[in-house]
Regions:
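Adenine nucleotide phosphate-binding catalytic loops in nucleotide-utilizing enzymes
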Residues: 89-93, 131-195
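Phosphate-binding loop of NTP-binding sites
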Residues: 1-133, 146-159
């Protein structure tokens, strides 16, 4: 596994992994962290362990999750589960079970799309480190312990101090326009919230 103290932020899902991991790496570096994107993009996981990075944004495929046993991510997310790769996994249930492994042993935050009951169930059934929280992503106004969108702002009601009464503006939807054009898709907004 990784050297002690270097957090892994793990991302899986049928669609959006590469985009989300790329954004996550940019956010971490903008915040001053020496971050590396690893997995299917960037550096292979096996080589990343030897790098000097302080934190890893890790893209994990269902194939990698099927064989991964020793990862304890600081935070993890399954963006979505669509029925692809069934030829390899054998069934939609087996595929979803492999994707669900991203949440195993998560230390701080199990992030999931609030509108996706299948992924929410993965979080509920995961064997996590005591104290890990479930954090939902909403494309509208977020409930407590969610991130969401209010009046064109991506907002946090999960990690702010008084989350029952306050939300923290993280970014403006227009911040995504350089990459996604003036009207980012729901998928782009969801990936940005995930990152």
């Amino acid at each position: 596994g990784p050297r002690a103290g270097r957090p892994w932020l793990c991302v899986t899902g049928t669609n959006g992994k590469t985009t989300t991991v790329g954004m996550l790496g940019e956010i971490l570096r903008a915040g001053g962290a020496d971050a590396a994107e690893v997995g299917n993009i960037g550096t292979p996981i096996t080589r990343a362990i030897d790098s000097a990075a302080e934190v890893f944004a890790v893209e994990l495929s269902s194939f990698q999750l099927h064989t991964a046993h020793s990862v304890s991510p600081l935070a993890s997310i399954c963006l979505n589960v669509d029925a692809d790769h069934l030829d390899w996994h054998g069934s939609a249930e087996a595929y979803a079970a492999d994707k669900a492994r991203v949440y195993q042993n998560t230390v701080r935050a199990c992030v999931y799309p609030a509108s996706d009951r299948r992924v929410e169930a993965m979080v509920e059934n995961a064997d996590v480190v005591e104290g890990a929280r479930a954090i939902g992503l909403a494309l509208g106004a977020p409930l407590v312990s969610q991130l969401g969108i209010v009046e064109g702002l991506l907002v946090d009601r999960a990690f702010v101090e008084d989350r029952a009464h306050h939300a923290l503006a993280l970014a403006h939807v227009s911040d995504l326009s350089a990459v996604y054009g003036p009207h980012p898709s729901a998928a782009a907004l969801s990936d940005a919230l995930a990152a």
